[in-house]
Amino acid sequence: MTGRTMHETDPTDTTDTGRVTDTTDTVRVTDTTDTVRAADVIGTAGATSETLSGTEGATAGKAASGTAAMRGEARAPDATGAGARVLRAAAVAATLPYLALKTAWLAGSDIGIPEGSVLLDPGVFFTVANAVTMAMDAAVIVLALLLTRPWGRRVPAPLLLVPAFTATGLLTPILACFPAQLALRAVGLGADPAARAAGESFLDGWVYLVVYGGFTVQGLALTGLFVPYARRRWGSVWQGASGVRLPSPTGVAAGAAAALGTALGVLYAYWAFGGTAGLGAERAALHSAETGVVSAVHAVCALLAGWCAVLLARGGARRPVRPLVAGWTGSAATLCWGLYLLVAALAPGTGEGGNTPAVILLAYAGQVVTGCLAAAVLTAFATRRRIPA
């Protein structure tokens, strides 16, 4: 963990074995047989005065002062800049419309649900899905606080990186697709009225605008908060060269991710540019420039996931920052959206049921596998670089 060094003056502490005095960030330890001068104060809260003896005592003093620094940093007042506070407020505010809708639906309201929609009689699956997605959006509030409050710096890395990876995966395609779809509609290239009416038989049109507009703000705000946080805490992971090649099993996983990612990229690119083979009659009839944008984003994410995994596994003299960022984004989006679409296609009562073409189901499953393989390579790379906990 990185942090600023803060200078504090500790009181004089006299014990049976020596005297420790700290007035200018210098710890002087006097013993009957040995004298240790320690001027390396680790952390941001100053040094901890202890009676030390010999070289082992000096080492223990450094560890103790580092621990005290972490605790002091967590107790420090919020020094977040004005920009970060604005982004935090935006992220929190952007969750409110979605949380309000989910709360209303769980309470039995039919706001935003048209006549004839399957959501009017949700059943167990939709009830559980509403509760889970509501909890996930509420987690955005916790994540925004964690990225901006002092206590967030001592949260173990996995407890932060897993929800951050999930948020990246779910929000990245929305950030790419939603503005593009609005632009296509504005210039008259959006979906035809029949396709739009089919979408509005599930939810009213305004619900999509409110929900995806909120997700867009959340994605932008969390990106603005996570990037500087990651730079401060884990900047060492992408400094210097990529290094030596990762072990053989990791290389095999990267190669498999690249092969699957390439196949998915070709398939989704074909659909993006107007191809309809494998979509089934219903989806082929609803194909438009808007659905083409979605397919194009899936293609790019799958390719990034696979080939960035290869670059990280191969190592070398190049800096890893670009493949690491692109691989993180691509693998997260490929895994999370592949899993979401697969569950939605197979879940009972969603209107999909057994009508989803096998090619589409295989594509969704391929996204999940590709994302998992690429994420495993990223984890191996970061572990080798000794990512701080």
For the regions a language model picked out, list residue spans one by one.
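Membrane interfacial helix motifs at helix-loop boundaries and amphipathic/re-entrant anchors
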Residues: 102-133, 177-212, 268-297, 340-367
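Membrane-water interface of alpha-helical transmembrane segments
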Residues: 78-92, 120-130, 154-164, 201-212, ...
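C-terminal transmembrane-bundle signature of multipass membrane proteins
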Residues: 99-105, 265-275, 292-389
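Membrane-interfacial, low-structure loops and terminal tails that flank and connect transmembrane helices
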Residues: 61, 66-84, 232-252, 389
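Intrinsically disordered, low-complexity terminal tails and inter-domain linkers enriched
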Residues: 1-81
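Transmembrane-helix bundle segments that line or gate the permeation/cavity pathway
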Residues: 2-8, 80, 84, 88-114, ...
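Cytosolic juxtamembrane helix at the C-terminal end of the final transmembrane segment
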Residues: 148-152, 223-244, 309-322, 378-389
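Alpha-helical transmembrane segments of multi-pass integral membrane proteins
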Residues: 91-104, 166-177, 212-221, 249-273, ...
